[in-house]
Amino acid sequence: MATPPTLPVTNQQAVQSQPPINTPAFRTFFSRLSTSIRDGLSQRRPWTELIDRSSMARPESLTDALSRIRKNLAYFKVNYVAIVSLVLAFSLFSHPLSLLVLIGLLGGWMFLYLFRPSDQPLVVFGRTFSDRETLLALVLSTIVVVFMTSVGSLLTSALMIGVAIVCVHGAFVVPDDLFLDEQEPANAGLLSFLGGSATSAAAAVSGRV
């Protein structure tokens, strides 16, 4: 009895595609951000000191209020950043649609431009987009989202509320000698990552344009 012929079988190796983002730069960015946030939060003032009623008094004049705000901003800067961030987070979580739109916009900038490998073109629906076209599309999308939707007004109102809370608190807290004797470290704490993050983003943009 004749054996049936053996059918040829071809083993195709799976082609592994490149990651959609530049993984080393992506990890470096978030590692630096996480480290800066931890260092900044470790330098925050005790919250009980922030709400100590014995250190609060009405300012005698506008000049006195501005002087207090300036000194308290240097002393409570990490706490104030946390307060403004909480106000922003509360506003966004109370408007889920705006939160999703903002997350989508930030994700577009990160995954499609900032952390995408420069040698990997962006292909959408079979069409290849250059870096300049991608940047233009993201800039236009940002303008539309910020100025033509409720996201921009929501962020602006939340920032104004947060800044108002900070200014009122700073105007009513009387700085003591501890405030005046303490030297403010340059680029320390929670705000230090802003310069590095801005530099990294600027370098990524300038390298593509």
UniProtKB/Swiss-Prot annotation:
<feature type="modified residue" description="N-acetylalanine">
    <location>
        <position position="2"/>
    </location>
</feature>
<dbReference type="GO" id="GO:0000138">
    <property type="term" value="C:Golgi trans cisterna"/>
</dbReference>
<keyword id="KW-0813">Transport</keyword>
<feature type="transmembrane region" description="Helical">
    <location>
        <begin position="73"/>
        <end position="93"/>
    </location>
</feature>
<protein>
    <recommendedName>
        <fullName>PRA1 family protein B1</fullName>
    </recommendedName>
</protein>
<keyword id="KW-0967">Endosome</keyword>
<feature type="transmembrane region" description="Helical">
    <location>
        <begin position="154"/>
        <end position="174"/>
    </location>
</feature>
<feature type="transmembrane region" description="Helical">
    <location>
        <begin position="185"/>
        <end position="205"/>
    </location>
</feature>
<keyword id="KW-0472">Membrane</keyword>
<dbReference type="GO" id="GO:0005829">
    <property type="term" value="C:cytosol"/>
</dbReference>
<dbReference type="GO" id="GO:0005794">
    <property type="term" value="C:Golgi apparatus"/>
</dbReference>
<feature type="transmembrane region" description="Helical">
    <location>
        <begin position="133"/>
        <end position="153"/>
    </location>
</feature>
<dbReference type="GO" id="GO:0005783">
    <property type="term" value="C:endoplasmic reticulum"/>
</dbReference>
<dbReference type="GO" id="GO:0010008">
    <property type="term" value="C:endosome membrane"/>
</dbReference>
<comment type="function">
    <text>May be involved in both secretory and endocytic intracellular trafficking in the endosomal/prevacuolar compartments.</text>
</comment>
<dbReference type="InterPro" id="IPR004895">
    <property type="entry name" value="Prenylated_rab_accept_PRA1"/>
</dbReference>
<keyword id="KW-0812">Transmembrane</keyword>
<dbReference type="GO" id="GO:0016192">
    <property type="term" value="P:vesicle-mediated transport"/>
</dbReference>
<comment type="subunit">
    <text>Can form homodimer. Interacts with PRA1B2, PRA1B3, PRA1B4, PRA1B5, PRA1B6 and PRA1E.</text>
</comment>
<comment type="similarity">
    <text>Belongs to the PRA1 family.</text>
</comment>
<dbReference type="Pfam" id="PF03208">
    <property type="entry name" value="PRA1"/>
</dbReference>
<keyword id="KW-1133">Transmembrane helix</keyword>
<keyword id="KW-0007">Acetylation</keyword>
<feature type="transmembrane region" description="Helical">
    <location>
        <begin position="95"/>
        <end position="115"/>
    </location>
</feature>
